[in-house]
Amino acid sequence: AHAATPLTGWQAHTDPFSFDTRFKPASSIDKFRCGTPAVLSYIALESSLDIFEQLDMHAIREKSKQLTTLFVDLVESFCSTYPLQLVSPRDSDQRGSQVSFSHPEGWPIMQALIAHRVIGDFRAPDLLRFGFAPLYTRYEDVWLAASMLFHILQTECWKDPIYAAPKLVT
């Protein structure tokens, strides 16, 4: 099977700097190049990498652990009367920057959370996944997310049929 691209550009040529007027596609993955990389985007990338070089990754990881531990503690405190089960490791050293809980009605609960601006993720059959980006997630955001989960469970607004409809993206 030969893959082809509908968009061809001069960098997809076998020898782009020969400036041959007849297009001869490269035989490697290079044939999928469309044109010159955007110089401005590379400048932005370089600037962002300069910022990243100044970051203390240990401090970022520590904040990640604090955010996820706070979320677990708040959810277990606020929602103790609901059938939520922590699926992620309790030990923050054993998990990344995400926390998963299971609930038999995970899909509509996550859809209700998303409708209330708490953006999480659902994984079949019953997982509610929450990601925490330590560079910009605030402790207040964690408290608000846990509070909204409690509100949705308490009011049972997740039972509204609008949240039951299947979607391609969770």
Residues of each region from the PLM?
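PLP-dependent enzyme catalytic core of the Aspartate aminotransferase-like
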Residues: W107, A112-T170
